[in-house]
Structures are given as structure tokens and as C-alpha cells.
């Protein structure tokens, strides 16, 4: 998916403006890992910015962009043919489109443990007619990419497909390439987890990388698990509208309650995610905002360490018991203060005498 006017066959058309003369930054998107395509679907809801704003390069200072995304790539292949969409990826391998950002969706299966066949592939080898595995594409393209972005928890850390007992040996991109891996531009793997992603988190991260590629932003700040620090630096609890109830020791026992959901299985106090603050679409929604528990889907230990999802977290029993004890005292003190503050001052009344305490100078 890309803007039709400035880019054709990877070359800029001459039109007199600096933006149109500039070669585009290509986005090569591989969604052939083990996944449900939920991250691609989620991204269509992005608004800050939207994928259309990125593809059309309408944001101030954003370079021309050509997005080659299997979900909605309306330009298809380099010669406008649906049958050769995969040619963009061969061009990336041959170095004919540069720079490009490699986006990987889905966890990476271990092809080495399979004696025959393959776990997942993306396009065919034109010489043999056999599928090219997802891991082989990563081997071919990652060394030539400006940056590698793992979209969704499956690509970031393995996710559901990498659960204990899985037959594929699935893993995340950092597990496959190495956690210390860096692109030719010196950029670490960038992980935007979520099951699926919060759409604006990914679009904002992608825009940051595009600005960085053109020298308009410093090196992207990441935490120890390669997540953008400004997006995943706080916990769900720290941005949750229900956090005040936790402090006061008030916990929901049913899902129709507005109180804290910890006893119903919410992991918000320890999960790094900004969904309660950011919402989901146009700032609306987000798991605890609409009555859902946080199941830890942005964390490297998801899902194994958070199961079973509907049970109270082990540490929650201790913390909620302690919170209930001191929360009762806090509530009582606040009620006393509230009763004092919930009354008008006594001097606001009728009468012939001024009782506000004002002393006239005459």
C-alpha cells in the first residue's frame, strides 16, 4: 500500500517538489509467521496516526513511504500485478529497494526440528516452485533492513504459538535473531507487543522510525525487552481508572462492578501496557475501561505465566488483603474529610449582617 503519485516501481517521479523527488522508504511486511493476522486487522483502526496518513506521507516531515502489506496492498507487485507481489521482497533481498523497514507478524517456528515439509512459508522460490519459509526470508532480509519491527506478541516474544508443549518450537524475532542483534543502521529489534497490538502504538512507533531514518529523531528508546519506552514504561494499573478502588481496598466480585478487577484475575498492577490511558479506537475502550481483566498480553511471559486467565493472581491475595485493611482506614478518613468539604461555608446566607469576616475600611 502506498501513495500512487510519488512512487512507481520503487523510483520517484519528477514533479518539482522535494518530497516527490525523494526516494521512498519501503515497508516490507511479512505476515506469514504463526499468527492469526490480528495485528494487521487491528492496525486498520489506527487514528494517531492512521495507516493511510503514513502511506500517503501527509504528516509534516514524513518521507515518502511505500507500504507492501499483504492485507491491503492495492498496488500489488512492482508492475501492478497481483501475481508478483512477492517480487518486492526479492527486490529487497537483491538490494534494489533501499532503505526498507522489515515488519514481521507472527512467531517464528523452528524449521530445523522438522524432518520434512515446513511449518510456514511466504511465497515460492521461482527456481524450484517450493515455498520459502518465513525464517529463510528473515535470514535474507534482516541484514539489509534499515530496521526490523516485530509487530504483536507472537512476533515479539513467541506468544500463544510458543506455549509450553507446542510442536513447532516457535519463538519471537529477538529469540531467532538474537536479543543483541542490530540492523545495518545500528537499530535494535523493535518490539511492539499486544495480542493484538493497540493500533496507535504500532503506527506511532513506525512513524518514529521513519523520522529517525531521515535524521529528525534520535535513536528510538527501548526498554530491556525492546519495547518503545514511552509506550510501555508504565503499568496498566498506573493508568487505570479503577486504580483508586484498589488503593481503598474495594474489589469487584462481578464483571458489572466499576471497582478494581484484581480478584477477578486482572494482572494490571504488574503488566507494562498503556491501553487504559490510550484507549483502543479514537481513545475509547481498552480492557479494564470496558470491564475486561488484563491478561498480560504485552509481556514476554504471555500466555503461560498468566494462566488460567480468570483466576486471581497469586500475589493478588496478599496485596488485596493488605489493601483491604488499610483501605478501610483510608476510606473512613476520606469520608470524614468529604463530609466537611461537601458543605457550603456558613456565611453564605441572607440577613442584614455581613458574616464573611470582611472588615470594611470605613
Where does each model-flagged region fall?
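Loop/turn elements at helix/coil->beta-strand transitions in domains of secreted/extracellular proteins
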Residues: 98-100, 144-147
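Short acidic, glycine-rich surface-loop motifs adjacent to enzyme active sites
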Residues: 99-114
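Glycine/threonine-rich flexible loop motifs
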Residues: 111-131, 159-166
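Iron-sulfur (Fe-S) cluster-binding modules
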Residues: 1-85, 89-103, 186-189, 204-362
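Hydrophobic/aromatic beta-strand patches that form the interior of the parallel beta-sheet core
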Residues: 28, 147-152, 190-192
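Catalytic-core regions built around general acid/base machinery
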Residues: 129-145
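Short, well-ordered, mixed-charge alpha-helical segments that flank or form enzyme active sites
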Residues: 36, 110-112, 156-160, 198-201
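Class I SAM-dependent methyltransferase SAM-binding "motif I" and its flanking Rossmann-like core
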Residues: 154, 158-185, 190, 194
